[in-house]
């Protein structure tokens, strides 16, 4: 997707996956469009225009993360989601806040590398097919002369060998042409072939993560990988699987990793989106100050320079955070946005409040999005030859149950529907392979039968739904 989408078009695209929350969609659409507008400015002014970071306020399960994730996917921007509670102050054991930028760059490198490999895929597949032909019809190894004197006294014999060798080479070449034709026509897809692949090195240093090594801006495994020789092992695969492995190897040879790295850093700096969840958990609770509050404030102060704009060292090189879009989110049940330190509040000038989901919202979530739950379950049961249908009243009943359980127990938003739908269709999903019916219709009576008693019993609701 192009970044030249208008705010209205962006909102329409988000509407395909997320129900309601117009204000939040509007805010992120404007932020994305501003990036496009900034790219059209002259270089001097472009550096001065920084993104307006967004603070989303709303309960869990109303679409905060999904809005940011879908936005990034819409324009092919690198996106990472981090939880503020996972970070610790500099000097303490745990993840330092700069790791979010390193994660973003890793994501960006992966995106760019994937795109570059897709660009050379056709050439790589041609090379892979050539290698497959050579593996399926191996050439005869030429014999080397053991004694140099044979050059002087073995002339006639050598001439005969050369003639025979030429005949053999022609025969192999002819056979390879035949195999290449069969490969091109998909006639050898199930043939077995032995290939050599790089053996995955075990991650020796995973246990050290978070113990200060991350602050070095590099992964020790990568640092030592150049010292440890890469081992190769033989694998026997079907031709169709071997082609994928060989195509991947050939594509990696065709791309320039230095170019990938430079483009990835530029993409992360100019288009990256970092979503900081649970930011309310590191705000002061408004009660008397405690050591926990001091620690939380330390994390806020560590986040501040990254959000303001600084340079973070990564294993790919220095990365500037000045133009990365930060979207922070939190429920703010126990704390208020004003409980964040003033400097950090000022770095999130756009605030949007996401509303709790109503019964009507639940109805829309069940049927409208492209990835709606009902569409998913219908597709799953269609694989068993069963046409699953829901009456409008049944959908309404499911939405009412979800809303009621959210009201009487913890409000987990749209995630409640996953639990309810799984419980509702549990027996059907279990019995599906043995059912002889072609069509099953879910009615309000069926919903009441499966969920009614559980909803009425608060204790059961807390444990089951």
Swiss-Prot record:
Whether NADP counts among this entry's keywords is no
Instruction: Name its GO BP terms in alphabetical order.
Output: protein unfolding; proteolysis involved in protein catabolic process
Quaternary arrangement and interactors, per the entry?
A: A double ring-shaped homohexamer of HslV is capped on each side by a ring-shaped HslU homohexamer. The assembly of the HslU/HslV complex is dependent on binding of ATP.
Give GO terms: molecular function aspect only: ATP binding; ATP hydrolysis activity; peptidase activity; proteasome-activating activity
SMART domains listed in its UniProt record: AAA, ClpB_D2-small
Which taxonomic lineage is given here?
A: Bacteria, Bacillati, Bacillota, Bacilli, Bacillales
Cellular-component GO terms for this entry: HslUV protease complex
Question: What family name appears in the similarity comment?
Answer: Belongs to the ClpX chaperone family. HslU subfamily.
What functional role does this protein have? ATPase subunit of a proteasome-like degradation complex; this subunit has chaperone activity. The binding of ATP and its subsequent hydrolysis by HslU are essential for unfolding of protein substrates subsequently hydrolyzed by HslV. HslU recognizes the N-terminal part of its protein substrates and unfolds these before they are guided to HslV for hydrolysis.
Pfam families this protein is in?
AAA (PF00004), AAA_2 (PF07724), ClpB_D2-small (PF10431)
> What name has this protein been given in UniProt?
ATP-dependent protease ATPase subunit HslU
Question: Do you know which InterPro entries this protein is assigned to?
Answer: AAA+_ATPase (IPR003593), ATP-dep_Clp_protease_ClpX (IPR050052), ATPase_AAA_core (IPR003959), Clp_ATPase_C (IPR019489), HslU (IPR004491), P-loop_NTPase (IPR027417)
Please state where this protein is localized: Cytoplasm
Q: For this UniProt entry, what is the primary localization, expressed as one broad class?
A: cytoplasm
Q: Which UniProt keywords apply?
A: ATP-binding, Chaperone, Cytoplasm, Nucleotide-binding, Stress response
Which sites bind ATP?
19, 61-66, 277, 343, 415
